Amino acid sequence: MLAVLGACAVIAGGTVAGLAATGSAGPAGTGGAPARAISGTSDPSAAARLNATSPAPASSQRSRSPRSSSAPSPRAAPAGKAGHRDPFGPAAASYLSGRAGTVLAAVYDLRTGRSWHLGQGPPQAEASIVKLDVLETLLAERADGDGTGLSASDRTLAGQMIEDSDNDAATSLWYAVGGAARIRSFNARAGLTHTAPSSCVICPGFAWPGWGLTTTTPGDQIALLRQLVTPSSVLPRAAREYALSLMQDVTPAQRWGVSGGVPARVTVALKNGWLPLHGTDSDWQINSVGWISGGGRNYLMAVLSTGNPSEQYGIDTIDELAATVWQRMG
């Protein structure tokens, strides 16, 4: 565990890495305010909370999208003009050169099958985007023919974990699916090759749930997202649509990140993560992954950022980068 945490420390110490954006053919989420701070053992204070706080009373009572409704099919998105230019471009490189921290990102165009990567560096801590991995593992484990196979309890916990980023729900499901070993097995089937599930949930010297120290790369997060938006050998259609419906119903306060600059009419399914590394409020891991479809665009985007001096700073960085990508993907 100390090795994993140590790796996070090394990552967080860096400045913006050399920016490299490359295109390759073939296979490989409107910004908002930061999450609320809630009291409780798994709901850290505003000064240092993992990106998965338990919902505030108002949020816990908000209406949710009906679970029987299907998320729109990614393949049904407007075709538009297939983009051929680098979605990051000089503007992204110029912007990030003046920002603190290390940013890694990837974009996958579902219209063309082309992908681009930005930044260089080792895998970074997932924080609460690992909850998407937990959800997909759960769906793969429970799949029953063409259905999700989820129990009422599974659905309640999954909704809390994705829509409200609830830590307790995530911990319950982490154990329910079999922990790191089963998640690692699912990841191998899903094509993730650079993701290492955390070996502990209660980690020595770390105040928050240890699953947030799972490390990953933007490329692996694109592979995980593709399991939801393209025909998958590991997830039936009902499971994919269910996961996307949760990601589209994320509480408004957490709809920042890859949704930055995206018009309200566009479909955005996302999961974000925020984690104060080393128990301080000056070294934040801020991540965002998701699917954006509409306005002539249909793409996946994953952003990892570490070494942020504050939570909001990291959110602002990803919002701005996402807005650039949205414009250039048109």
Language-model segments: which ranges?
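A short, well-structured edge-of-sheet supersecondary motif
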Residues: 84-119, 291-292, 301
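Short glycine/serine- and small hydrophobic-enriched flexible loop segments
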Residues: 136-144, 223-230, 323, 327
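Structured C-terminal helix/loop/strand segments within mature extracytoplasmic catalytic/sensor domains
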Residues: 1-64, 80-92, 232-250, 282-330
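Active-site-proximal beta-strand/loop segments in catalytic clefts of secreted hydrolases
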Residues: 108-110, 162-166, 173-177, 191, ...
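Second-shell loop/turn segments in exported
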Residues: 74-82, 117-125, 144-148, 156-160, ...
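Conserved active-site loop region of the serine DD-peptidase/beta-lactamase
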Residues: 226-274
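Active-site SXXK
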Residues: 113, 123-148, 161, 301
